[in-house]
Every structure is written in structure tokens, then in C-alpha cells.
Amino acid sequence: LMSYQLEPAQMALNKTRQRILIADTVGLGKTLEAGILMSELIARGKGKRILVVTVKSMMTQFQKEMWNRFTIPLVRLDSSRIQSVRAKLPTNYNPFFYYDKTIISVDTLKNDLDYRTHLENAWWDIIVIDEAHNVAKRGDRSSQRSKLASLLANRSDTLIMLTATPHDGKGQSVASLMNMLDPTAIADEENYTKDDIEGLLIRRFKKDIQDQVSGAFKERVITIERCAASAREEAAYDIFADMKLQMDESRTRGKGILFKTSLEKSLFSSPAACIKSIDARIRKLEKKYPDGDMPDIVTLKELKAALELITPVDFSRYAKLLKL
């Protein structure tokens, strides 16, 4: 641990209720800082019940870090697991009381109105909202995520919010998060000062703590490596360049992103990523045209066949990476 990582916990513990937005820049260890505060609260008997809400892509990483660093066991909840819990319990029993320490996706909670009543009648000692910028209020409208966060803000004494990007350039977004932490903090979301949010927010950049880390942050050195496409990659690229998709041609005036554009992105990611995109589109087309009377299916299968010929040896960027 580095000394600056203890500061959020120290700041929060100086208050009667631990409610804080940790907004350090990427790489300073916001998850670690949250874990330090959570561990101290557990040691003080104020952390028996914990709820962590994050985006789905971060659930595993957060769960592992809490266990490996702090021995805090978080049970992963999703819709199917909640339904499984509910099946074991009497009808009037709240499923959120079944486990004491859980982690759940923000979208799992926001998408099911049935959970709202259970959340309104549940209570936790600690609630953590990771990637908190996703729940900030935007303008005059409150998203489902923002409404969910506002509800959760009232279901715990301790509220820890984490984000590296606390605002979108507008003061209202930060103000909405501050008012979740303390409804009395900001009277006018368009007109407030740093003093209004003192003690609620901590934000540091690498330059702010450089003297504490003694060279821990090395300067990033970027070099450009060039690699020529293999013959099989060139063959697949040629098929793609000449490819015309009927569905795209008929939708060129639409506002959506054309499939060929998204396919191009996956193609330059990796052959496997492109094949996955092709398979998904073929499944949709075959469902819509069960007789197979759709030229796009044949065209996509031709590109897929060319991509399947690209072995790891033929995948030029991968081969180059192995040599670095």
C-alpha cells in the first residue's frame, strides 16, 4: 500500500457517516482504496452487509480483488441466481437478505421493476457503486441507472462511489452524485463551489501524488511496429473490400451504423472476432429467411471461409507480437 491510498478511508472515517466519491484518475487504485475503507468498517462492526453495484464487465475483477486483497467474499448475483434464491424462499421474503455480501450488475437491477420493492425494503451497511459516472443525472432527465442509484443511496449509511471520470463537462452531473451522497450538499446544481463538496469527493492525478510513489509510475514509451499482411489475410481483405451486402444497400439512408462498418472493425481486430460477428449475423438472417433466400448469407459464408484459413502463423499482428 502507498500512503495516498489510505487518504480516502481516513477522510471518510472522520465523518459520522462514511459517504464518499473516490474520483482518482485511472491507475491510482480506486478499487483498492474502496477495499481499505470497507475492511476498516468491517473491523469496526459496520460492514456485515455489503452490496457492490458495477457494470457487468467489471464484476469478476472487482470480486477477485476484494477476495485476494481483503478476504471479503462477494457472492455474484444475476437474474437467474436471484430467481433461484426466490424459488427457495417464502413469497413474502426479500431475496436481497439471503446473502450478506453480494456483487451485482447495475443493468440487472435497473431492468427489472420487480426488484424495486425488494430494494426499497432492504438495508445494507455498505453500498459501493463502481463506475459511478454511469449513474449520474444528465440534464433534466434521470436515466434508469440514475434512478436506481438514487434509490440505493437511501438504503445504506455508508455509500462509496468510484469513478475516474466524475463529470461529462457539465457541473450538474457531479452535483447529482454529490446529492446522492448528501442531499443537503448542493442547493443549486448549476451554481456551487468546491467548499460545498468538501469531504464528499477526493480526486487526485498522478502528478498530485508523484512525491509519494518514488518513481512507481514510469513514463510510457510508445513505438510503432509495422507488419505486412499475410497472403491469406490479403485474400480475406480482398473479399471484404469487394463485398456488397443487400441489407446494407437497402439501409444506406438509415441512421443506424451499417453492419459492414462494424464488420470492418472486427476484421481488423482479429479473424476470430470477425467470424463471431459473421456467425451472429448469419443466425439472424437464417431466422428471418428460413428458406435461405438471402444473398447476404452466401456472401458472408464466403468471407467466413477465407477467415477460417488464417492460422496463428498467418495472423500477422499476432505473429509480430510473439516476436517482440
Describe each PLM feature range:
Residues V26-G27:
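Walker A/P-loop nucleotide-binding motif
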Residues L21, G45-G47, R253:
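Short helix-terminating capping/connector loops at secondary-structure junctions
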Residues L1-K15, R19-I20, K301-A319:
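Pre-Walker A segment
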Residues M38, I42, F217-A228, A273-L324:
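Conserved Helicase C-terminal RecA-like lobe
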Residues A23, V53, T163:
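Residues at the beta-strand->loop junction immediately N-terminal to the Walker
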Residues T91-N92, F97-Y98, I103-W124, A136-H167, ...:
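Inter-lobe coupling linker of SF2 helicases/translocases
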Residues L1-Q10, R17, K30-E33, S39-N154, ...:
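SF2 helicase/translocase NTPase motor core
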